[in-house]
């Protein structure tokens, strides 16, 4: 918690804190934020969130970082100090690393020793990496995994020694333990780094019919047809997220990056569906029914000859709430959108688009039917068995506390309900983005090893990735 940490060190009054999604407020002068030139030091936590240069928030952050300082103060020069914090600086593509460097470096006049032009320096690494990934994709049977791993390591070693080491202040656990001054400071404060054991997989089994359904479903989710890359694909088109790609004539000119947008959205939703299937059958069923509903809603738009494309107003949400199309159009116009840029007719689309929507709806209906008939949940059964007979063994868990992470909020809710009902435990706390603020105090009392006022009211916390970064949960062994 940055606010608490700055307060602890007595420097909170010198700082302002802002979330990634609100950077535009500084640019546009909204709220109580200072002018972008008034900041002397910019600290970016979890900097990997800015490795993609296409998002608007990247541009906002880069502008804030590179706007000259208005007041020099005791530190001379107009350039700001920029600190990017990341636990895994090399866990990025070369393109991502270049984007991060360009948040605080001049592209063609870098201050990094031995490197003047960053894009030129990175171009060969990016080319080698992309070539390596293409070759790896063609290796269908993973016969050259060791070769690819070796070549990737060699590539990143070059980037590390020539660039990353020169701009990185390392503070790894080994670094701190092996420097005498740091080690003494740890000893004086009675701080001990625990030895982290490697991950331990728990393998659950699917019976014959469920196993077949799982893998046939995975094929439908991933075998997306494509005229060039996968012409014989039998899976979902994800057409609901590709509307702009199939605009034609004058309508298409309004979306010059249509292919890029649809490719990106298709990839995101495909990964989302696969992750939901692997997370829990409950979460996957919910996603299936949602995907079917929004696909059928778009087909209904064609029936009314009014297809709305307006990402800024969340058309899907409005349809879920029962809004008529005319009301959604009026709402879009009220928000400053032009009707001619928002509402399209049947003839504005390639006829193949509606066919793809109907094919998706057919596949999704069948998947919904098949998964609605599944009552067993072997993953849950194995997990409950481990909870009852292993996870709270004093030999491996002397504190009797447990943290359970899931990428899916639906899985968090499902798991919380199942464990409370079946194990009759009342010490289970669920934490997601929607309730984190309200539960912060009790969470810290029960799980933060540094918190003065400790409690054992809750011994299990089930959470989404909202607690995966920057939160002390060390009472959970």
Task: Describe each region flagged by the PLM.
Residues 185-206, 228-460:
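Conserved Helicase C-terminal RecA-like lobe
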